Every structure is written in structure tokens, then in C-alpha cells.
């Protein structure tokens, strides 16, 4: 490093600015006291919506984007499984699976539900005559 000139004001100004700055401005607060100081300070908002932007409430918007179809579940599962029939002995297991599981009640899992239903249809329990 080069030696500084005797009359250089830059390091003195830097040290003065560093000494006068708030405690939390140097990086992470140290200890509990620093954490309490930063919690009391108002936090700036990162996003402020524009006034009159014409946004709709999220509930009505989701209803417009995803219209409910009562046969949507049946359409998806019939598309994935194909023609699947269940014997009368197996109807209890079918109803338990179709109406009471997450796979058959959540649209994200309909493909898994279709796989479970086809495995149930070809299982030895349901294929007995």
C-alpha cells in the first residue's frame, strides 16, 4: 500500500461517516440488542399497488378463471383409465377410494387416482367371479 499524504481528507470523512451511521447499517446486527433495534424501525414496503389499477378481488378472479364443472372429475378419470368396470363385490372398495382419498378429490392427483382405480379393477379381490 502507498502511504497517505498528510493532508488527505478522504479517510477522515470515511471514518466520520462510519461513526455517525446507525448501528444496523453495517450489515448483520450483533447480538440481541441489535436485533431489537432493527425490529423497532419501520420496514419499507417493497410493493405498493397503484391506485385505481382496476384489480378484482382474488376470489372473484379465481371463479372466473376456473369455472366448476360437476363432471370434471369423472371426465378426467375416464380419460386416464379408459372403460373400467367394477364387480358388485368390489363396489365398497371403489367408493372408499373414489370419494375418500386425496388422489381422487384433488385435481392435481387425478392421474394417480386413475392408476389406483385401474389397479383395483384388475386386483384378485375384484376379478373374482
From Swiss-Prot:
Widely expressed with highest levels in thyroid and moderate levels in stomach, trachea, small intestine, prostate and brain. One of its GO terms (cellular component) is plasma membrane. Disulfide bonds join 90-126, 104-113. Changing residue 115 to E: Reduced affinity for receptor tyrosine kinase LTK. It is found in: Secreted; Cell membrane. One of its GO terms (biological process) is positive regulation of ERK1 and ERK2 cascade. One of its GO terms (molecular function) is receptor tyrosine kinase binding. Changing residue 76 to E: Slightly reduced affinity for receptor tyrosine kinase LTK. Its main location: secreted. Residues 25-35 have a biased composition (Basic residues). InterPro entries: ALKL1/2. It comes from the Eukaryota. Belongs to the ALKAL family. Cytokine that acts as a physiological ligand for receptor tyrosine kinase LTK, leading to its activation. Monomeric ALKAL1 binds to LTK, leading to LTK homodimerization and activation. In contrast to ALKAL2, does not act as a potent physiological ligand for ALK. This is ALK and LTK ligand 1. It comes from Homo sapiens. The lineage of its organism: Eukaryota, Metazoa, Chordata, Craniata, Vertebrata.
Amino acid at each position: 500500500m502507498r502511504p497517505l499524504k498528510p493532508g488527505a481528507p478522504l479517510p477522515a470523512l470515511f471514518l466520520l461517516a462510519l461513526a455517525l451511521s446507525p448501528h444496523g447499517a453495517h450489515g448483520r446486527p450483533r447480538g440481541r440488542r441489535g436485533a431489537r433495534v432493527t425490529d423497532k424501525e419501520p420496514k419499507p414496503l417493497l410493493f405498493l399497488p397503484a391506485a385505481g389499477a382496476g384489480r378484482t378481488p382474488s376470489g372473484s378472479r379465481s371463479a372466473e378463471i376456473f369455472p366448476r364443472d360437476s363432471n370434471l372429475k369423472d371426465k378426467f378419470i375416464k380419460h386416464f383409465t379408459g372403460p373400467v368396470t367394477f364387480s358388485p363385490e368390489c363396489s365398497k372398495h371403489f367408493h372408499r377410494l373414489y370419494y375418500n382419498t386425496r388422489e381422487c378429490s384433488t385435481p392435481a392427483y387425478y392421474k394417480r387416482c386413475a392408476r389406483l382405480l385401474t389397479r383395483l379393477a384388475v386386483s384378485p379381490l375384484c376379478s373374482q367371479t
